[in-house]
Amino acid sequence: MHDNTYLPDHFLRHIAAIMPAHLSMDEFVASCRRPLRRSIRVNTLKISVAAFVARMQPLGWQLDPVPWCDTGFWLSREDESVPLGNTAEHLSGLFYIQEASSMLPVTALFACEQTRRDGMLLDAAAAPGSKTTQIAALMNNQGMLVANEYSSSRLKVLSANLQRCGVTNVGMTHFDAKVFGQWLPETFDAILLDAPCSGEGSVRKDEDALRNWSIESIDEIAAVQQGLLESAFHALKPGGVLVYSTCTLSLQENQAVCQSLLDKFGAAFSFDSLADLFPAAEQACTPEGYLHVWPQIFDSEGFFVARLRKHYSVPNTMFKPGKLGKFPFLPLPAKESEPMLREIEAAFGVVPQGNLFGRSEEIWLFPQRFEQVQGKLRFDRIGLKLAETFKKGYRLTHEWALAYGDGASKGFVELGIADAREFMMGRDVWPEQAAGTGEVIVRYQGHTLGMGKWVGSRVKNALPRELVRDNNLFV
């Protein structure tokens, strides 16, 4: 029990006034004081669910399915000597540590047949990346996903999680999400707006989440949310799908925000009922068809999810194209890109998918739909950095290895557990297999740890310094 969880009386009175009649305040308080169950989501860009379960169950991992996400599991481990975030499987991007309720919005987005997996999608408030990587996995790295984050301090962790999970179809931006309705009207096939909120549903992982809670602050946040939702609606194509979600409980930030959009544009869209989204979803369904997940219903965080479909265009008084600086990349000429791609295929048996662009001594792989937003939006990062060039050639990057290394049919070395430990500690290794030449993908149990280079019978370690770990990562 978290007996120190801060639940102020004025907050509890507020909740009691909106709690559905069939739910108990005593159970609500008790659930808020219980530790949150640990949950993870398998990253199917790297491994199938069946293969992940087969790999981890012999290590004493008990995986109980999350009913609303077919790649999500509640987790308990027999051996917790290695912190979950420091396991080799996590660092290789095989799974993402994600609260179970937060898997719901993306499930709702992709449960709609109108959501194009190869289309142009927007995650309007993306960091730290749990839902962004979930979307990218369901897109199978096809199309393009714009991942926007307003907080500059959270961009680095978003980028790191995208690289770790092998995501290649994302362009990262750093704006107040209200600009999308202004700059990119009717551009996106599907949008997730997991809006900034008061976080009332997150007390089980942060006992001080409500330390500064007040009705006044909720009203201020709700006004911001209304502006974000209206802008996202303008950025959505007719026929497109939008999911609005929060990790809070108050009606002002949830139902009332949805109602504000209905009041303005109700004839142009409709909300879907999510009562059949998963077995037992009706337990959290509101009369409007939204999901209002109270923490005691599914023993999870509190969450809210609503899904709408846009039927018609609406007048957009927001439209105002953004001012962009000079784009620092140039398309790589075919005489340079084609030989490079042939060399990569010859060496590793895999062909990077996308368009090659160059900047200074860098070669980048951009998503295939990038041209649809080129010149309309300033990006902090697009796709993945494929290689760094020098006088005598180029050097493939660690992030390329994480994205494509598992699919390589040659040009890789498989390490045993002892050598894998050494490699993740930043040390060179002497594999048992016959030595090769040049760059080599380093794998353990079929999954990529990083890049190395053959020097005689030794593989020289090329792990980025920030990924070197002094402790054992293998159970």
Swiss-Prot record:
Gene Ontology CC terms: cytoplasm
Highest taxon of source: Bacteria
Task performed by this protein: Specifically methylates the cytosine at position 1407 (m5C1407) of 16S rRNA.
Residues where S-adenosyl-L-methionine binds: 125-131, 149, 176, 194
Organism: Aeromonas hydrophila subsp. hydrophila (strain ATCC 7966 / DSM 30187 / BCRC 13018 / CCUG 14551 / JCM 1027 / KCTC 2358 / NCIMB 9240 / NCTC 8049)
Gene3D superfamilies named in the record: 3.10.450.720, Vaccinia Virus protein VP39 (3.40.50.150)
Catalytic activity: cytidine(1407) in 16S rRNA + S-adenosyl-L-methionine = 5-methylcytidine(1407) in 16S rRNA + S-adenosyl-L-homocysteine + H(+)
Protein name: Ribosomal RNA small subunit methyltransferase F
